[in-house]
Amino acid sequence: MPVNEYGQMIGEPVDDTPGVLPSLVRIEGQYTIIEALSVEKHAEDLLAVYGPDTPREMWTYLFQPPVENLEELIVALKQMLERKDRFYYAIIDKATGKALGTFSLMRIDQANRTIEVGA
């Protein structure tokens, strides 16, 4: 491992070619599936997660309140998917086949090969 002028071990140099954008490829794990968010496929399941019966403390650090009904959720999901600077995914429980939540890959900086996982 390389050592700097202070005698500290440092990592190997990283290739400086720009990173590539993520793809919305489906990823299957032991307990969950990650797939591209779809209004048609996931909205009804997500109402249980983001709807009016959701515990209020779940929303402490989020920028929006829970939705009141399915129609409001559909509008919100469509607005999310219109964004071209984020990649939205649904998290699916393999045992039930139901969507348990969502996340996005955002603040993508290809030049510095960084990405943030968020809401």
Q: Which residue stretches match the model-derived regions?
A:
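GNAT-family acyltransferases
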Residues: 1-119
